[in-house]
């Protein structure tokens, strides 16, 4: 039995890589598309047009096709990016008039796009009822909406939540038990016994944050000279002792299954899901029990889809946000072309019923709630440029 080579997944969380090719069948060249949009823009309402800048999954026919049927004649375009900052830079570079929706990881809306007036708030009367039906991590009666979906003052709703998941590291539980991996956490990779027995999934931005966890301090602060030096030594050791480094999660999952490695650095439910779906349940995303960020040693991500501050915003943008709340569309987003993730709407019986036992096992539903509870949100790293330069040097010069 071999693992399907689903190449579309390879750059899903590789925030530092350059934007790659666009999804087959829905692909278009960004520069030419931008030119066409500017040429076609009028002062009238764009009822028959919608342009979406997103992570892969939302740009698939499983998601877009039903929306086209619901809004006959709509000119619907979706471009997938491979890192959040590059997508934000499109808006900064003058493409506010191009895009209607932007789909990014949780920290960017309130920390950058909202202060820079790149997005506008959602109608709370329309969208809060949908949020109130989500899993408790994203809405509960006591605390309300997850703060990453709100403006810093808590008054404005900045986007809708859907896909999410823990993201720390992955092990073969036939070689390293789940209990051992959760107990040891990221320092597991510094054990001399693991030399040449692990891989590194080269998702650079995640690697930088996870190296901070490995070194024993939070990524989400400006670091002291002593911490920077410890980061350097930790990065050097990680790369020097790794058996393989690859941006291809399928290759790393295959190495786990074949016994070439016992675990890989940076990964989670998302990267393990396709292997698990094909029957390799020993491939498991791990969320450590403890760590340096308020006692937590694991991380998670979720996406927020926001309305762009387009001066001629399409009214179909808000319609799309509501459309993807439908149970069948929630399922399509969750399992779009091999991109296997849980979605926040799975608290609803009608959505949950769409998932088979095999699919629930693929996304590690059995432990998802507890793993999310001990995971910290992905956030902006203040001195990311410095740490990334050290990281890149350690990777380049590994011996």
Annotate the PLM regions.
Residues 97-102, 120-170, 197:
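A structural signal for short loop-to-beta-strand junctions that line the ligand-binding cleft
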Residues 113-122, 154-156, 274-290:
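Ligand-binding "clamshell"
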Residues 39-112:
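Early extracytoplasmic/lumenal segment of secretory-pathway proteins
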Residues 1-14, 35-38:
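N-terminal secretory signal peptides
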Residues 199-203, 207-211, 219-287:
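Ligand-binding pocket segment of bilobal, Venus flytrap-like solute-binding proteins
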Residues 365-399:
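Conserved C-terminal helix/tail region of periplasmic/extracytoplasmic solute-binding proteins
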Residues 10-29:
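N-terminal export leaders
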């Amino acid at each position: 039995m071999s693992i399907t080579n689903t190449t579309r997944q390879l750059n899903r969380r590789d925030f530092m890589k350059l934007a790659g090719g666009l999804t087959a069948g829905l692909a278009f060249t960004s520069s030419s598309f931008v030119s066409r949009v500017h040429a076609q823009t009028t002062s009238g309402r764009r009822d028959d047009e919608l342009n979406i800048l997103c992570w892969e999954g939302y740009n698939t026919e499983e998601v877009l096709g039903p929306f086209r049927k619901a809004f006959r004649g709509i000119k619907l375009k979706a471009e997938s990016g491979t890192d959040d900052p590059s997508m934000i830079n499109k808006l900064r570079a003058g493409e506010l008039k191009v895009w209607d929706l932007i789909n990014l990881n949780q920290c960017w809306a309130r920390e950058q796009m909202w202060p820079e007036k790149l997005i506008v708030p959602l109608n709370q009367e329309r969208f809060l009822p949908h949020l109130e039906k989500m899993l408790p991590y994203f809405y509960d009666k006591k605390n309300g909406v997850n703060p990453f979906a709100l403006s810093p003052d808590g008054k404005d709703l900045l986007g809708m939540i859907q896909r999410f998941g823990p993201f720390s590291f992955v092990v073969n539980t036939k070689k390293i038990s789940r209990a051992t991996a959760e107990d040891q956490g990221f320092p597991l990779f510094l054990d001399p016994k693991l030399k040449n027995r692990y891989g590194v999934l080269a998702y650079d931005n995640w690697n930088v944050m996870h190296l901070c966890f490995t070194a024993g301090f939070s990524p989400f602060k400006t670091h002291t000279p002593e911490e920077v030096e410890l980061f350097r030594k930790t990065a050097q050791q990680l790369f020097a002792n790794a058996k393989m480094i690859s941006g291809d999660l399928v290759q790393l999952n295959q190495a786990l299954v074949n016994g070439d490695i016992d675990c890989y650095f940076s990964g989670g439910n998302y990267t393990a899901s396709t292997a698990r779906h094909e029957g390799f349940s020993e491939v498991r995303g791990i969320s450590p029990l403890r760590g340096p960020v308020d006692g937590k040693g694991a991380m998670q991500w979720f996406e927020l889809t926001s309305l762009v501050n387009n001066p001629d915003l399409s009214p179909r943008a808000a319609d799309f946000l509501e459309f993807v709340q439908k149970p069948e569309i929630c399922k399509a987003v969750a399992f779009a072309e091999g991109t296997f993730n849980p979605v926040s709407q799975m608290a609803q019986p009608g959505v949950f019923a769409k998932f088979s036992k095999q699919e629930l096992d693929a996304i590690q539903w059995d432990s998802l709630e507890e793993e999310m509870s001990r995971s910290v949100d992905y956030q902006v790293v203040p001195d990311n440029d410095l740490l990334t330069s050290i990281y890149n040097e350690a990777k380049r010069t590994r011996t």
